[in-house]
């Protein structure tokens, strides 16, 4: 979803890997790109799904609005209120964590509990699609992840925070989000390491099995040839 999918940060080895300061800087750049806005078109029975990599315990907010194509004006116009949008979100274990019907314009929110790839799917309620007779529906979607999902103007008004207090709170939440992203990167590296070790082990056992098969075939051929020569009284 995001314009920048992420910065891969690995462990520390002198001369080969980035220092802590540079890694933190790259993570800040990555966090800055966590908000992603786009638009897409869907047909009457079509479902659009997007994959977003999200750390655990991270809030995600999605805002969307729909438009119908006006053939007379030859342009997209805001959709009628009767045209709804169904939003479904699944976690990396394929469990549904959000499934709800919204209006033609709305906002959905969820919090991740498992790190990894989350699937966000949207499709319209087909019973209302007769309103535009098989045309295309344009959906504008804006997704904010983590600290970017917070409305700090609302937080400042609600908690009566000064500008300095609000800034400190923003910095604290940014640091917390960076820690979550670092933990997520370590989790991904651990999974990759486990997958690599499992693959290497399978390759090793397959090589051993191939060797045993070749040895067994060689022994069988030797015994078969010996029996053949004995039957022909050549030995």
Swiss-Prot record:
Q: Which residues carry this modification: N6-acetyllysine?
A: 160
SMART domains this protein is in? EMP24_GP25L
Motif COPI vesicle coat-binding: where? 228-235
Q: Where is this region: Required for interaction with STX17?
A: 121-160
Which PROSITE patterns does the entry mention?
Answer: GOLD
State the signal peptide span. Answer: 1-37
* Coiled-coil ranges from the UniProt annotation: 154-184
Processing after translation = N-linked glycosylated containing high mannose.
Q: Where in the cell is it found?
A: Endoplasmic reticulum membrane; Golgi apparatus, cis-Golgi network membrane; Endoplasmic reticulum-Golgi intermediate compartment membrane; Golgi apparatus, trans-Golgi network membrane
TM segment ranges: 203-222
Which controlled-vocabulary keywords does the entry list?
Acetylation, Coiled coil, Endoplasmic reticulum, Glycoprotein, Golgi apparatus, Membrane, Protein transport, Signal, Transmembrane, Transmembrane helix, Transport
**InterPro entries named among the record's database cross-references:** Emp24-like, GOLD_dom
Among the GO biological process terms of this entry, one is: protein transport
Q: What residues bear carbohydrate chains? A: 125
The stretches that face the Lumenal side, renumbered to this chain, are: 38-202
Query: One Pfam annotation, family name?
Result: EMP24_GP25L
> What positions does the domain GOLD occupy?
47-145
Instruction: Please report the record's description of how this protein sits within the membrane.
Output: Single-pass type I membrane protein
Q: Is Endoplasmic reticulum among this UniProt entry's keywords?
A: yes
Q: What does this protein do?
A: Appears to be involved in vesicular protein trafficking, mainly in the early secretory pathway. In COPI vesicle-mediated retrograde transport involved in the coatomer recruitment to membranes of the early secretory pathway. Increases coatomer-dependent activity of ARFGAP2. Thought to play a crucial role in the specific retention of p24 complexes in cis-Golgi membranes; specifically contributes to the coupled localization of TMED2 and TMED10 in the cis-Golgi network.
Describe its partners and assembly state.
Monomer and homodimer in endoplasmic reticulum. Predominantly monomeric and to lesser extent homodimeric in endoplasmic reticulum-Golgi intermediate compartment and cis-Golgi network. Probably oligomerizes with other members of the EMP24/GP25L family such as TMED2, TMED7 and TMED10. Interacts with TMED5. Interacts (via C-terminus) with COPG1; the interaction involves dimeric TMED9. Interacts with PTPN2 and SPAST. Interacts with STX17; the interaction is direct.
Q: Which family does it belong to?
A: Belongs to the EMP24/GP25L family.
Q: What is this protein called?
A: Transmembrane emp24 domain-containing protein 9
Q: Which gene encodes it?
A: Tmed9
């Amino acid at each position: 979803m995001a314009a920048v999918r992420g910065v891969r940060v690995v462990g520390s080895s002198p001369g080969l890997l980035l220092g802590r300061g540079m890694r933190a800087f790259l993570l800040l750049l990555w966090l800055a790109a966590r908000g992603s806005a786009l638009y897409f078109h869907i047909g009457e029975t079509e479902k659009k799904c997007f994959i977003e990599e999200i750390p655990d315990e991270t809030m995600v907010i999605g805002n969307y609005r729909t438009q119908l194509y006006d053939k007379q004006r030859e342009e997209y116009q805001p959709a009628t209120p009767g045209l709804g949008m169904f939003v479904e979100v699944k976690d990396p274990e394929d469990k549904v964590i959000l499934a709800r019907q919204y209006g033609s314009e709305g906002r959905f929110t969820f919090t991740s509990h498992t790190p990894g790839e989350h699937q966000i799917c949207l499709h319209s309620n087909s019973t209302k699609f007769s309103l535009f007779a098989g045309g295309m529906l344009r959906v504008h979607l804006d997704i904010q992840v983590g600290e970017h999902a917070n409305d700090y103007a609302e937080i400042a008004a609600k908690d009566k925070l000064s500008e300095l207090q609000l800034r400190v709170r923003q910095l604290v939440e940014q640091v917390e989000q960076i820690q979550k992203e670092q933990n997520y990167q370590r989790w991904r590296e651990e999974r990759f390491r486990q997958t690599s070790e499992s693959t290497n082990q399978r390759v090793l056992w397959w090589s051993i099995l191939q060797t045993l098969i070749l040895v067994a075939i060689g022994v069988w051929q030797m015994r078969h040839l010996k029996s053949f020569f004995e039957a022909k009284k050549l030995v």
